[in-house]
C-alpha cells in the first residue's frame, strides 16, 4: 500500500508538468502534459474498491480495473469470495468515472485454450460488464499477459485498444524505480501503463 501511495504522490508532482513553446502544434496529451500514465488494476480484488479507488479519487485520478466476471460476487449480500469485488461495487466505481474492463470471463490463458473458447470467454465477460455497469468495455487486458497473435486478433475486435505493454508495480518495486520510470516517460513524451494486482494480498502484493 505504501508503494502505491508513493506512486500516486510521484505522479502528482508531475501532473502539472507541460511543454512550453510559442509555436502552435497539436498536443499529444490532454492539457499538453509531457507524458501520460494509466493506472491499471487486474483481477477484481476487493481492496481495489476499498483502498485503490478511494486513493485515486482523493487525488483527482481515475483508474482502469480489469475483471474476470466468473470471480465477481453477485452483490453485497451474496459474497462467496471475500477477496473479490461485487458487481454492485464495480457499478459504483464505474459511475464515479473509473473504467471497468475485460480481463476474460475466467482468466483463460490464450495459449492453453481453443480460439473459439477464447472468443466465447471474451464475449461473455463483455456482456456481464455491460449488464452490471451499463457500460460496454472498449479495452481488453490479456490474462497472464499472454498475447498470442491469434488470440489478439479476436481481442482487438470492437476495441479502442488492448494492453500490450505494462510496467509491473508490486512488491519488487522501489520508490527509486518509480521515480526513474516517470522521469523516462517525461523525457520521451511516452505513455506508461502501470499494472497492479493486490496492494496487501494477492499476486505481487
How should these model regions be labeled?
Residues 2-3, 16-39, 47-51, 58, ...:
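N-terminal pre-catalytic segment of deacetylase/amide-hydrolase enzymes
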Residues 4-14:
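Sec-dependent N-terminal signal peptides
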Residues 35-37, 57-150, 157-160, 189-202:
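Metal-dependent polysaccharide deacetylase catalytic core of the NodB/CE4 family, i.e.
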Residues 45-46, 106:
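Short, glycine/acidic-enriched loop or turn micro-motifs at the edges of active sites
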Residues 51-55, 150-154, 181:
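A short acidic, amphipathic alpha-helical/loop segment
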Residues 159-170:
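Acidic, His- and aromatic-enriched active-site or binding-groove loops in soluble protein domains
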Residues 176-184:
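A short, acidic, amphipathic alpha-helical segment used as a generic capping/interface helix at domain edges
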Amino acid at each position: 500500500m505504501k508503494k502505491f501511495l508513493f506512486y500516486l504522490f510521484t505522479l502528482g508532482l508531475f501532473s502539472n508538468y507541460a511543454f512550453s513553446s510559442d509555436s502552435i502544434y497539436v498536443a499529444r496529451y490532454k492539457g499538453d502534459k509531457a507524458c501520460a500514465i494509466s493506472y491499471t488494476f487486474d483481477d477484481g480484488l476487493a481492496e481495489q474498491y476499498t483502498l485503490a479507488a478511494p486513493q485515486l479519487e482523493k487525488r483527482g485520478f481515475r483508474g482502469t480495473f480489469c475483471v474476470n466476471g466468473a470471480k465477481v460476487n453477485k452483490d453485497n449480500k451474496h459474497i462467496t469470495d471475500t477477496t473479490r469485488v461485487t458487481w454492485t461495487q464495480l457499478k459504483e466505481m464505474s459511475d464515479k468515472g473509473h473504467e471497468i474492463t475485460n480481463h476474460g470471463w475466467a482468466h483463460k490463458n490464450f495459449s492453453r485454450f481453443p480460439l473459439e473458447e477464447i472468443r466465447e470467454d471474451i464475449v461473455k465477460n463483455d456482456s456481464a460488464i455491460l449488464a452490471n455497469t451499463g457500460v460496454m468495455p472498449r479495452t481488453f487486458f490479456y490474462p497472464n499477459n499472454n498475447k498470442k497473435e491469434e488470440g489478439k486478433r479476436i481481442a482487438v475486435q470492437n476495441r479502442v485498444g488492448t494492453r500490450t505493454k505494462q510496467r509491473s508495480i508490486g512488491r519488487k518495486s522501489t520508490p527509486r524505480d518509480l521515480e526513474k520510470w516517470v522521469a523516462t516517460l517525461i523525457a520521451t513524451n511516452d505513455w506508461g501503463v502501470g499494472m497492479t494486482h493486490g496492494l496487501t494480498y494477492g499476486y505481487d502484493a
